[in-house]
Amino acid sequence: MSAAGASERERLVALLRERSFEQKRVVLASGRESDFFIDCKQSVLTAEGHALVGSLMFEALGALPRCEAVAGVELGGCPLASAVSLTSFLRGRPLPALYVRKEVKDHGSRRLVEGDRGLVPGMPVAILEDVITTGGSTLKAVEKLRTAGASVVGVIALVDRLEGGAEAIRAAGLPVVAICTRRDFIPDNPPG
C-alpha cells in the first residue's frame, strides 16, 4: 500500500471508529451474538467516507485477478460499488457497478442483479462487502452473479470480523482482501 493509501486507511479507520463502531452485545445477520457492532453505512455514506472507500477498495483490486466490473451486496455493499466505480472512472479505468439483491422484488424489473445490462457472459467481477462474518451472504451473492453469467474473481471487504467468513470464501476458491479487521477496533481481542 502506498504512503497515501496508508494515510487514507488510517483516516477511514478513524471515521469508522467515530461513526460506525459500537461495543455492545448484538445479534448479527448471521444469527450469531457479538460483543461489537459496526454499521459501515454510517461512515461510507459521508462524502469523505465515500471518497476513502472508493480509493482504498479500487487500490485493493490490484490484489485480485483483473476484473471488468464491481458488485456490491445489498445493502451495505451498494455504496461501496458506487464509490469504486466512480473512482475507477476518475482514474481512467472505468468499472461499472452492479448491485446484488438478497431477493427478487415482486414488482419492477424483478432482477437479482441490478446493472446487469452491461454484464457479458464470463465477465470477471469483484464482489465488494461491507462486513464479512460467516461469509454466507457473500457466497450467496457469488452464486447469484454466476447465475447471471459473471465470473467472480474475488472479494474485497471493508471489515473482516475474523470469525471464519474470509476462510469460508477462500475455501470456495476465491481470494479475499480486507481493508480493516476487528483488530482495528478491538486490538488483541479474539472473537467469541
Swiss-Prot record:
List of residues binding orotate: 133, 161
Catalytic reaction(s) noted: orotidine 5'-phosphate + diphosphate = orotate + 5-phospho-alpha-D-ribose 1-diphosphate
GO biological process terms, semicolon-separated: 'de novo' UMP biosynthetic process; pyrimidine nucleobase biosynthetic process
Documented EC number(s): 2.4.2.10
Gene3D superfamilies: 3.40.50.2020
Job description of the protein: Catalyzes the transfer of a ribosyl phosphate group from 5-phosphoribose 1-diphosphate to orotate, leading to the formation of orotidine monophosphate (OMP).
Family statement drawn from the similarity comment of this UniProt entry: Belongs to the purine/pyrimidine phosphoribosyltransferase family. PyrE subfamily.
Protein name: Orotate phosphoribosyltransferase
Originating gene: pyrE
